[in-house]
Amino acid sequence: MGKPATPRALPENEAKAVARMLRVSPQKLNLVAALIRGKKVDTALADLEFSRKRIARDVKKCLESAIANAENNHDLDVDDLVVSQAFVGKALVLKRFHARARGRGARILKPFSNLTIVVREVRAEAA
């Protein structure tokens, strides 16, 4: 028997990809995510290709995964895809110890982030 299939959380014209545990602070990752929000996917890929930020490589990989999900799993047209959402969340924070003078210590925080990219198929109206 088994449980019935859960309904799809996204509309039929959307696909998403999630990159978890990226070793960067959410604030820095959000700078790159804001760069691609609302753009066509080919423009967003070009922007990420030439971005000087280190995390842009991981964001590009996640965007390519979202495009592949849209094409292979949901039969969407790649040429009509737009980045509808790109949002960042906090993951765990590694805490490390840094020895300082006079027997003291300082805490080093190494944050991790999660990135979710949602692409939407926007049909061009025939003029």
UniProtKB/Swiss-Prot annotation:
CC terms in the record's Gene Ontology section: cytosolic large ribosomal subunit
Complexes and interactors: Part of the 50S ribosomal subunit.
GO biological process, one term: translation
Gene, per the UniProt record: rplV
Organism encoding this protein: Methylorubrum populi (strain ATCC BAA-705 / NCIMB 13946 / BJ001) (Methylobacterium populi)
Keywords, alphabetical: Ribonucleoprotein, Ribosomal protein, RNA-binding, rRNA-binding
Protein name stated in the entry: Large ribosomal subunit protein uL22
Record-stated family: Belongs to the universal ribosomal protein uL22 family.
Coiled-coil stretches: none
